[in-house]
Amino acid sequence: MRFLFYMLLACSAVVAGEQAAAAKELRLNSFVHRSFDAHIHAQRLLRDRRSVDEERGLPTVIEKTKTLFSTKVTDKTLQRWAANKKSPQHALIRLDLDNAGKDLFTKAKFADWVSFMTKRNPQNAEAAMLSALMTRYSDDVLSGMLIAAKKAPDTKTIATNLQIQQLRGWMKKGKTADDVFNLFNLKGKATSLDDLVSDGQFAPWVTYVTALNKGDPKKTNMMVVKTLTTYNKKTHKGVYDMLSASKNKQLAADLQRGQFDNWLANNVQFYDVSAMVGAKGTPRGSPQRLFVKDYVAAYNKKHQL
């Protein structure tokens, strides 16, 4: 059966409804058959406050002054801003959010900004929001903010939707599986499959890897294992042992097959495979010996030996 199915099955107990729905939405069709219309800007560095103020110039001072004397922002106000095509930056300033930094999603008025952006961009609100945020925050900073926001009830849904847009942008930019694994702060859990599965970022990451491989389960398994090996002290045996010890048996079996296919693709000798799975000293019929036996058969078939 397909790897992604087992991944989602394993994650179902720990991924909340919105996350599961978001992961489902981010399947292959979202990346391959739908156009990327987020129009995300190339600049991704967290910009220097002074240079931003210099670019905005006098309008910034005026908007700041309006903030000091304005009454409470109402839905009618947001509607007027949207009708007048006010910029996302204008709304952030008027809502006194432009200096919120990494705490933007925790601010009470952030919901007003989301409402304004939805009114202004009813067809692609999340894409427009992400585009605006990416002019203010670098990839790693914004990713960390979204991960934190997904854990808070009030911002979980919007953060999940924004993360979908972020993944689409990364796909367009050509970020690798390792890049996203790192941005999702998963590398510290690469020594335990069970810890990875329990992390809410694992499901979106695997979905991203699946999209990178155009839905091919074999290539997906191989890429997942390659990334795990990179962050598992770069030891193949460490990954094999980790998978063998996992409670997520079907997922572990799929990934061990990915490890098998990686070694076969790289023409690793059977005695090296035997050492990496720890077959020596195990009884006949052990999982390790059966693994090596299957590998020898596949290797000989590949090379017509």
UniProtKB/Swiss-Prot annotation:
Taxonomy, superkingdom: Eukaryota
Main location: secreted
Disulfide bonds: none
Compartments reported by the entry: Secreted; Host nucleus; Host nucleus, Host nucleolus
Presence of keyword Protein biosynthesis: no
Keyword Endoplasmic reticulum recorded: no
Motif (RxLR-dEER): 44-56
Signal peptide (residue range): 1-16
Induction: Expression is induced during host plant infection.
GO cellular component, one term: extracellular region
Keywords (A to Z) from UniProt: Host nucleus, Secreted, Signal, Virulence
Its biological purpose: Effector that enhances P.infestans colonization of Nicotiana benthamiana leaves.
Protein family (similarity comment): Belongs to the RxLR effector family.
Free-text comment on this protein's domains from its UniProt entry: The RxLR-dEER motif acts to carry the protein into the host cell cytoplasm through binding to cell surface phosphatidylinositol-3-phosphate.
Official protein name in the record: RxLR effector protein PexRD25
